[in-house]
Amino acid sequence: MPTINQLIRKKRKSTGKKRTAPALEKCPQRRGVCTRVSTTTPKKPNSALRKIARVRLTNGMEVTAYIPGIGHNLQEHSVVLVRGGRVKDLPGVRYQVVRGALDTAGVEDRAQGRSKYGTKKG
């Protein structure tokens, strides 16, 4: 515990904020190429086959991104747009693929929340 005089001489150092999506390097999204598309199982109370893609970004980093929505058309060498946003029940997945951008098709027959899944009206 510092004394009052020590605090006057040298202020307390604040701990900086931890970045949630460091691979994007302060960009809102990044383009990348899929190196592997697969499924994985979530953490303990949940059970499913979640679709994920390993993506090499334009800055050279390789990240694991979640593919949201029902069904997708991604395969190896697909060019995708990646945004930040973790998936709570998948450890190590801190990015998501943007649906309806570049090689990623939007979700078919989506009626509500269409803007999040790249689906046109009608």
From Swiss-Prot:
One of its GO terms (molecular function) is tRNA binding. The modification 3-methylthioaspartic acid is found at D89. SUPFAM superfamilies: Nucleic acid-binding proteins. Residues 8-20 have a biased composition (Basic residues). GO terms for biological process: translation. It comes from the Bacteria. Part of the 30S ribosomal subunit. Contacts proteins S8 and S17. May interact with IF1 in the 30S initiation complex. With S4 and S5 plays an important role in translational accuracy. Interacts with and stabilizes bases of the 16S rRNA that are involved in tRNA selection in the A site and with the mRNA backbone. Located at the interface of the 30S and 50S subunits, it traverses the body of the 30S subunit contacting proteins on the other side and probably holding the rRNA structure together. The combined cluster of proteins S8, S12 and S17 appears to hold together the shoulder and platform of the 30S subunit. This is Small ribosomal subunit protein uS12. It comes from Natranaerobius thermophilus (strain ATCC BAA-1301 / DSM 18059 / JW/NM-WN-LF). The lineage of its organism: Bacteria, Bacillati, Bacillota, Clostridia, Natranaerobiales.
